[in-house]
């Protein structure tokens, strides 16, 4: 079989679509391309199974629609796989309708939006299959191998049989992640994602996932809890083996482990000690997502010794009421303590905040602004990111707000973080965006600038700060 895994180009006056490997979609004024781990794994699985594979990211490759279409249809695919998210699903419906006029290929949709609402896309466009859940790479391999025999389909597949839409039931996350191959980086054009990424201080960089996806998996706003309601990990030694290959074969200098939360406990200890034993800590830097409240100062010290550079935490708000409503299982005081410990251990700390909660007003937002700026001024946070609260379909937050009449619209185009879609009776949209800008301006505080200056060690740092300044300007533009 001939299988194309694609991201059609998206021309928009709003900016560049940040679609791949992204839990929250945004249009960016400055291009940012994130390596898509699961799609790349799917491509590798299919190639190893003997199929011909085209991996075509029209966004990251910056192809024109004409160039993209020409390359895709010259490949003559039997299957075309498209990952979608809520803010662009209507664009993908239109693209699929046009694609079906040009080719007899079966079109497959994947992603968190169609996992939450599979019936919708089956009704709104002539898509042939929808693969639900986060293990769609395994499902795609099964689908192609089944060659149209629905009796062989695994759970989680939606399909058409004559004029009837059918499905194989709820998806199951029972695949062994150690059975997934190491990604064929050449097949998926890894270099497209190696530099235009604000997280990387050193380049070239790339991504892996040691786990799928987060061991908490209860945050009510997170779209990936729809894909991954449970948690599994790869073998720690196998992960180190892959990292060693990436360093030796591709010269990778920085690695982002984009598991929703990096595995902790014995897994983390084994991983760090093996990285140190092989001397990989002297050859690359490692970034990861983490949650507050699980690691001690000694854990951060071990991570730093193992070559970790950046740890990303989701804070979302400095108001305990909001953290509790989001089921963050987090206390505000844990944030300060965790940031201080990580910084003291020599790690850079990146924080994410969200604004535009239905129950927060100017006073609560000001509290979060003060908190974020304090962490920057103390040097306990190196970087941070602010976004609007977007309740994605399938999340508990979406269900809560929809039931309470708390949504401005169900027009998915509007869920792109350009404006608030949540009704905020206690704060205007202008006040919300002003709060976000106040946080970003916290980077320009004298104490924050001083910490940045005193932490400068190499030319890589200077290049990173320059890219960071451009990102800061871009964020101020994005939320003006």
Q: Residue locations for each model-derived region?
A:
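Radical SAM enzyme core and accessory elements
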Residues: 2-5, 69, 196, 395-398, ...
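Short glycine-rich His-centered loop
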Residues: 3-31
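Flexible glycine/acidic-rich beta-alpha junction loops that bind and position SAM and/or redox cofactors
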Residues: 13-16, 118, 265-266, 321, ...
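Glycine-rich beta-alpha loop elements in corrinoid/cobalamin-binding modules
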Residues: 38-173, 394
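Residue-level recognition of beta-strand->loop/alpha-helix junctions
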Residues: 55-59, 83, 226, 353-355, ...
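Short helix-capping segments at alpha-helix termini
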Residues: 100-105, 126, 148, 276-283, ...
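Catalytic cores of alpha/beta
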Residues: 120-123, 299, 359-374
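Radical SAM [4Fe-4S] cluster-binding motif and immediate context
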Residues: 178, 183-350, 357, 367-370
């Amino acid at each position: 079989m001939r299988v194309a895994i694609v991201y059609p180009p998206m021309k928009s006056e709003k900016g560049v679509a940040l679609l791949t490997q992204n839990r929250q979609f945004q249009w960016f004024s400055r291009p940012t391309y994130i390596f898509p781990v699961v799609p790349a794994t799917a491509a590798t699985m299919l190639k190893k199974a003997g199929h011909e594979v085209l991996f075509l990211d029209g966004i990251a490759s910056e192809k024109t629609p004409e160039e993209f279409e020409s390359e895709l249809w010259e490949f003559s695919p039997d299957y075309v796989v498209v990952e979608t998210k809520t803010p662009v699903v209507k664009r993908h419906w239109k693209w699929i309708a046009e694609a079906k006029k040009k080719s007899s290929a079966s079109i497959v949709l994947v992603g968190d939006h169609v996992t939450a609402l599979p019936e919708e896309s089956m009704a709104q466009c002539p898509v042939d299959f929808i693969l639900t859940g986060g293990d769609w790479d395994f499902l795609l391999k099964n689908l192609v191998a089944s060659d149209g025999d629905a009796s062989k389909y695994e759970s989680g597949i939606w399909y058409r049989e004559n004029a009837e839409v059918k499905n194989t039931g709820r998806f199951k996350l029972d695949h062994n992640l150690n059975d997934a191959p190491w990604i064929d980086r050449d097949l998926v054009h890894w270099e497209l994602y190696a530099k235009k990424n604000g997280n990387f201080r050193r380049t070239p960089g790339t991504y892996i996932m040691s786990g799928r996806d987060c061991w908490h998996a209860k945050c009510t706003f997170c779209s990936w809890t729809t894909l991954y309601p449970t948690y599994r990990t790869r073998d720690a030694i196998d992960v180190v083996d892959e990292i060693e290959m990436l360093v030796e074969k591709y010269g990778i200098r920085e690695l982002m482990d984009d598991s929703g939360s990096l595995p902790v406990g014995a897994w983390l200890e084994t991983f760090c000690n093996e990285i140190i034993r092989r001397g990989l800590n002297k050859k690359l830097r490692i970034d990861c997502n983490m949650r507050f409240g699980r690691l001690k100062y000694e854990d951060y010290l071990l991570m730093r010794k193992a070559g970790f550079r950046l740890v990303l935490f989701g804070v979302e708000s400095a108001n305990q009421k909001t953290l509790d409503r989001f089921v963050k299982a987090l206390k505000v005081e844990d944030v300060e303590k965790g940031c201080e410990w990580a910084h003291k251990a020599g790690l850079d700390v990146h924080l994410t905040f969200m604004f535009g909660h239905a129950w927060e007003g100017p006073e609560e937002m000001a509290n979060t602004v003060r908190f974020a700026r304090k962490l920057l001024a103390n040097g306990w946070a190196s970087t941070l990111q602010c976004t609007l609260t977007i309740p994605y379909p399938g999340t508990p937050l979406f269900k809560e707000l929809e039931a309470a009449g708390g949504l401005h619209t169900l027009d998915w185009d509007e869920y792109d973080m350009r404006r608030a879609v949540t009704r905020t009776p206690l704060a205007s949209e202008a006040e919300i965006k002003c709060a976000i800008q106040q946080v970003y301006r916290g980077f320009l505080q004298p104490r924050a600038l001083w910490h940045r200056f005193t932490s400068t060690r190499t030319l890589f740092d200077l290049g990173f700060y320059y890219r960071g300044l451009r990102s800061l300007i871009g964020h101020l533009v994005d939320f003006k």
